[in-house]
């Protein structure tokens, strides 16, 4: 086993809906180091054990994260850590074709994780209200109640990729224990955004943050101008520190997930967590974030601010989501841009992709940025709706209809 030596830090905690303390830094378990497509178990084990020793108690995985649930189960059992940690995993509702499928899939997750209960269970990528209604028709609310009564599930939430309007609708559709959203200083006004995060907080719903550094875009993929802004600032901090401090400054944020695949990442994030506080960012530093956002967005193809005035589209196109993915593609982050586009347009009853546009022009009448939305959506379709996209979309559509 690889040995990692970290100085002890004082982990900070924030409370969930029922007063349980969760570490402000959570461990995202989707991207463990791999070799030949398989998780390198000795490295993963050392990282996870050190994380627990340093006070991290929230570990996020999912059914579709290849090998992740099984790796966590093996490591936590081997090191007798189950009582010290909280496991969050996810129901891939888009794979469920019948009520019986709920029990079958959940049982498989318990087996993989080598446990008889899940602390935080999420509806994975619950991106529109129709998907929730489909689950309701399948008896999901009764199923959740039974699992909670039996102690097999302690809290239930959902993860989300989409606009703030739909996010708020889903929040209001059920008595959720928590939620999980993509949120960072670049996405303050896209995805669920600050509006969604603040609305969840107003309802007493804890918010778990994913993509806090935009999949590395806010660290290793910053444009030169943004890197210079950071380098020239009187207070010297790493790009990761700027990104994470922005989140922990907000009282609405409960846990920030980070996929820490090395001892360096783990050590840096632990240090930042220990030094971060709510309300710590002064006005002059907020101006730096605004400068960074402008620098990052200088080369964007579409000047969409994700205000949502163009919504709803009569054909269901997620216009802000499509443009966000398109801009990310042209920011030289093509792999994650493609995944973003898949998340916001598939795995739901009706596709919300750019290809649905019929050119009615209703959206353009309401756009405060005067974007030629119809023309730009054609470019999005041409760029992102590749043969691979169409294959995945077809498969996703089959799953959610049965």
Language-model regions: role of each:
Residues 35-36, 49, 53, 96-213, ...:
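Glycine/proline-rich, positively charged
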Residues 72-75, 166-170, 266-269:
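Hydrophobic packing residues within well-ordered alpha-helices of enzyme cores
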Residues 63, 67, 127, 161-162, ...:
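Short beta->alpha linker loops
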Residues 50-52, 56-57, 76, 175, ...:
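Structured C-terminal cap/extension of enzyme domains
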Residues 91-93, 384:
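Acidic, glycine-rich active-site loops and adjacent beta-strand->loop/helix elements
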Residues 70-89, 141-150, 202:
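Alpha-helix-loop-beta-strand connector modules within alpha/beta enzyme cores
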Residues 2-85:
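N-terminal binding-site loop/beta-alpha segment at the start of enzyme catalytic domains
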Residues 23-27, 59-60, 85-89, 118-123, ...:
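Hydrophobic faces of well-ordered beta-strands that scaffold small-molecule active sites
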